[in-house]
């Protein structure tokens, strides 16, 4: 049977419970069981980053030659924490790797490196960066505004995922 529709297999109950999941994905999400064969209509397997729970679905995808799509919280995740039930505003969908794993290229890395190909996106990216700064947006948008004291000793900024 020929695969014409984009159907993404998902083994994770956590992923399948994400509100409005289909609106973030390049295909229709379908919940799969690790105890049954992958339906022929499935075009790829979606997993959450490099979580330990992704290992078996990745192995199953590789065993039948299907690509793996890695998902992760978007850089602006939500208006609160996901564990508190706040739905995501963005999800990273990566067909190559995932942005925090430097051992393999990611879609984001390739986009950044492709200076000629991403020129049409430059103005939009500048506008989005300005909006993030102007509106004090953060990943979860929960931190109180930071105002540095007039006299502040030298500091080291530590950036974490």
PLM features: residue spans?
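Catalytic-core helical/loop segments in enzymes performing group transfer/polymerization on anionic/lipid-linked
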Residues: 1-161
């Amino acid at each position: 049977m020929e695969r014409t529709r984009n159907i993404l297999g998902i083994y994770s109950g956590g992923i399948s419970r994400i509100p409005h999941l289909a609106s973030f994905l390049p295909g229709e999400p379908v919940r799969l069981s690790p105890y049954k064969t992958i339906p022929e209509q499935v075009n790829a397997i979606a997993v959450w980053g490099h979580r330990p729970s992704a290992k078996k679905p990745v192995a199953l995808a590789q065993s039948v030659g299907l690509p793996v799509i890695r998902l992760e919280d978007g850089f602006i995740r939500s208006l609160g924490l996901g564990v508190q039930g706040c739905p995501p505003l963005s999800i990273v969908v990566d067909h190559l790797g995932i942005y925090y794993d430097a051992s393999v290229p990611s879609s984001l890395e390739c986009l950044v490196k492709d200076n000629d190909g991403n020129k049409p996106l430059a103005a939009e990216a500048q506008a989005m960066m300005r909006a993030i700064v102007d509106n004090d947006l953060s990943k979860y948008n929960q931190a109180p505004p930071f105002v540095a004291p007039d006299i502040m000793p030298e500091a080291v900024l530590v950036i974490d995922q």
